[in-house]
UniProtKB/Swiss-Prot annotation:
SMART domains: Aldolase_II. Belongs to the aldolase class II family. Disulfide bonds: none annotated. It comes from Rickettsia prowazekii (strain Madrid E). InterPro entries: Aldolase-II_Adducin_sf, Aldolase_II/adducin_N, Aldolase_II/adducin_N_sf. Gene3D superfamilies: Class II aldolase/adducin N-terminal domain. It comes from the Bacteria. This is Putative aldolase class 2 protein RP493.
Length: 231
């Protein structure tokens, strides 16, 4: 399907799942080898995003098509620099919820204590908080370096970045990361008890099984999300 159609749908799905944060987060997508990407106009709520109002932005942050409400320097730096460094990445979701932010602030990070979390066993990166990403050279380089070759990164004291080779793969990672973070927060809110954590052997086997369970990761779920929002 059309990239703009699917990206607009992703915004609506994120809003439906309450994974938006008013106007403060952003999702983007591009075609393979493209030197530009699509992203929403900073200032809209996710429910308001349509194929018609998506912006076309160069990897250097120049608006090529569309009308913006406010120049989102931080957002354009994040998306543009990841796309430059990672030709395999065709979709980037940046979001922050109470659960993802809470887990990002824990020194232990995301623990392998649920099947949701095991999707990311030894496959998640961390980026230390350094205010807004406004220094194109210094901060953006560190951002990309911290992501490494992973598709998911927790931003300490801030939230998360989820990437994908497709929009539906990025959505898949986002949903499972949020469920994993919620579960960990629930456990942290209970009386301190010793946690049952699967062995390293089981964790390694499970992440391999989970990520090879379907040929096109997230596609089945994506089609269900589209039916849910009537798109």
């Amino acid at each position: 399907m059309d990239i703009k159609y699917n990206l607009a749908a992703a915004y609506k799905i994120m809003a439906y799942l309450s994974l938006d944060d008013h106007t403060y987060t952003h999702l983007s997508a591009r075609s393979k080898n493209a030197d530009f990407y699509y992203i929403y106009p900073f200032g809209l709520r996710f429910e308001e995003v349509t194929t018609e109002n998506l912006l076309k932005v160069s990897l250097d942050g120049k608006i090529l098509e569309g009308e913006e409400y406010q120049y989102n320097k931080t957002g354009y730096f994040i998306h543009g620099n990841i796309y430059k460094a990672r030709p395999d990445v065709l979709a980037i979701f940046h979001y922050h919820t109470p659960a993802s932010t809470a887990v990002s602030a824990l020194k232990c990070g995301l623990l392998p204590i649920s099947q949701w979390a095991l999707h990311f066993y030894d496959r998640i990166s961390y980026h230390d908080y350094n205010s807004l990403v406004l220094d194109a050279d210094k901060q953006s380089t560190k951002f990309v370096n911290d992501l490494k070759q992973n598709y998911v990164m927790l931003l300490r004291n801030h939230g998360a970045i989820t990437c994908g080779k497709t929009i539906h793969e990025a959505m898949f990672y986002t949903y499972h990361l949020e469920q994993a973070c919620k579960t960990q927060c629930l456990l942290n809110s209970t009386i301190q008890q010793e946690l049952i954590i699967p062995s390293v052997e089981i964790c390694k086997k499970t992440v391999k099984d989970l990520l090879s369970f379907e040929e096109d990761l997230g596609k089945r779920d994506w089609e269900a999300w589209l039916r849910l929002i009537n798109m």
